Swiss-Prot record:
Protein name as catalogued: Small ribosomal subunit biogenesis GTPase RsgA
GO cellular component term, pick one: cytoplasm
Name of encoding gene: rsgA
Protein source organism: Prochlorococcus marinus (strain SARG / CCMP1375 / SS120)
EC code(s) of this entry: 3.6.1.-
Annotated GTP binding sites: 137-140, 189-197
Residues in CP-type G domain copies: 88-247
Pfam families given in the database record: RsgA_GTPase (PF03193)
Residues annotated for Zn(2+) binding in this entry: 272, 277, 279, 285
Cofactor binding, per record: Binds 1 zinc ion per subunit.
Compartment(s) of residence: Cytoplasm
Length: 309
């Protein structure tokens, strides 16, 4: 992550608080020696403002942005953002830049597993075009047969779910390996499914920064009021997001088939007679109707047709 350019240091925006930006930099070899002995951590954070010219030019700063920092005061742990690098992408709810993965977190019980709700969250994740992982929390609350039922169902949808329990640690090793392979993964899901509990479980294993900034932030048990990145491993980050129970959609009807992996896989090997086939009642449609979420597909397609009418 480290980069120097005319006395500017590269970092990643972890959080926005009021008019300030918390930026993590990896500068163990750059921080003045006397100060380095006090902090003892290479993942160092600065509380930053941004140059007014960025606003004049219409350059917003979002969590996940890579930025250049100047006017650094190592003692006060402050700096000024002078440049925002071009983004690879930006998801909008909530705004997070340079996302590589979407992690849908749903509970197996309390709140109960809702297949229709899970399907809609997965569809929303597929809209991003990014890699999608589904995590099933509270594994310890259900028996093996029920888990197998949900696992097989999600596999037919095109996913490999990761069931976990923060009570007994089941599945955490597999999830950790998956998180380690990500650059920036966003946790999404309904309220109350255990996203924040999962973050709190992982936090002891994460390199938590020390110094004045951490004391100013008074971080204790994590609860989600805004989006924030957490550094895991070396160059991997996860973003927790406020929970919401009903994803909003504005999908173009022609793009709806791309939200269903089980339909996409058919389209890779089959071709319909008409290029604009919506896989409903068109003649010579090559797509099978014999898949579980076909009714979900039809209903959602009609929903989007009505929306765009």
């Amino acid at each position: 992550m480290l980069e120097i350019n005319k006395d500017r240091i590269k970092g990643i925006v972890l959080a926005l608080k009021a008019n300030y930006y918390i930026v993590q930099i990896d500068t163990i070899n750059l921080i003045p020696e006397l100060f380095k002995k006090k902090i003892g951590d290479h993942n160092f954070r600065l509380l930053c403002t941004k140059r007014s010219r960025l606003s004049y030019k219409g350059h917003s700063v979002s969590v996940g942005d890579f930025v250049l920092i100047e006017a650094i005061d190592w003692t006060a742990e402050t700096g000024v953002i002078s440049f925002v690098e071009p983004r690879k992408n930006l998801i909008t709810r909530p705004p997070v830049a340079n996302v590589t993965d979407v992690i849908i977190v749903v509970s197996l019980l309390d709140p109960s597993f809702d297949l229709n709700q899970v399907s809609r969250f997965l569809m929303k994740a597929e809209e991003t075009g990014l890699k999608v992982t589904i995590v099933l929390t509270k594994r310890d609350l259900i028996d093996e047969k029920i888990l197998e039922k949900y696992d097989k169902k999600l596999q037919t949808w095109g996913y490999q779910p990761i069931p976990i329990s923060i009570v007994n640690g089941e599945g955490i090793q597999k999830l950790s390996a998956r998180l380690k392979s990500m650059k920036l993964g966003v946790l999404c899901g309904p309220s109350g499914v255990g996203k924040s509990s999962l973050i709190n479980y992982l936090l002891p294993k994460i390199s938590i920064p020390i110094g004045k900034l951490s004391k100013k932030l008074k971080r204790g048990r994590h609860t989600t009021r805004h989006v924030e990145l957490f550094s895991i491993y070396s160059d991997s980050f996860i973003a927790d997001t406020p929970g919401f129970n009903k994803p909003e959609f504005y999908t173009e009807p022609s793009q709806v088939p791309q939200l269903f992996p089980e339909l996409r896989s058919q389209l890779l090997i089959k071709k319909c007679k008409f290029r604009n086939c919506m896989h409903l009642n068109e003649p010579d449609c090559a797509i099978s109707r014999d898949w579980e979420r076909y009714s979900n597909y039809k209903n959602f397609l009609q929903e989007m047709l009505n929306y765009h009418h």
